[in-house]
Amino acid sequence: MSKFIDPEKLEIEDRVVAINRVTKVVKGGRRLRFAALVVVGDKNGHVGFGTGKAQEVPEAIRKAVETARKSLIEVPIVGTTLPHEAVGVYGGGRILMKPALEGSGVAAGGAVRAVMELAGIDDVTSKRLGSNTAVNVVRATFEGLKSMRNAEEVAALRGVSVDHLAE
């Protein structure tokens, strides 16, 4: 279980990734609602996502931002990129994320780009494998980011020094 990150202490920026129009057919006709997917982050290693549903788009976005601020995770960053390669899987969505050389930029599409930019990762290469549904792609990206470990964490888990890992 990851530790709680207080969103009040961070300068958080949000980005709407997707808005879906959802209809429910009832006896009297169709009921229209909107579902919003929002990613929030401080561009300094903290990122979260949330979904919200409401009858109006602004209200759905507000609910999604509220949920996203409660689901912040910390992402290990080495320089301007990821510490190592990772694959995130959620449902049918799979994301392959690879560290890139400084100056490469964010080579990622749509939902993954939003997550990477708001997490503060400036150089990364990613490939979406499987489902391209925005919600599954974002969840898979988060699963991949949660699996990331920096050298200090790996050394501590193995009970060796960081210098020993470098050999």
Curated annotation (Swiss-Prot):
The keyword Ribosomal protein applies. Keywords: Ribonucleoprotein, Ribosomal protein, RNA-binding, rRNA-binding. Pfam families: Ribosomal_S5 (PF00333), Ribosomal_S5_C (PF03719). Residues 12-75 form the S5 DRBM domain. InterPro entries: Ribosomal_Su5_D2-typ_SF, Ribosomal_uS5, Ribosomal_uS5_bac-type, Ribosomal_uS5_C, Ribosomal_uS5_N, Ribosomal_uS5_N_CS, Ribsml_uS5_D2-typ_fold_subgr. GO terms for cellular component: small ribosomal subunit. One of its GO terms (biological process) is translation. The keyword rRNA-binding applies. It comes from the Bacteria. One of its GO terms (molecular function) is structural constituent of ribosome. The N-terminal domain interacts with the head of the 30S subunit; the C-terminal domain interacts with the body and contacts protein S4. The interaction surface between S4 and S5 is involved in control of translational fidelity. Part of the 30S ribosomal subunit. Contacts proteins S4 and S8. Belongs to the universal ribosomal protein uS5 family. With S4 and S12 plays an important role in translational accuracy. This is Small ribosomal subunit protein uS5. The gene is rpsE.
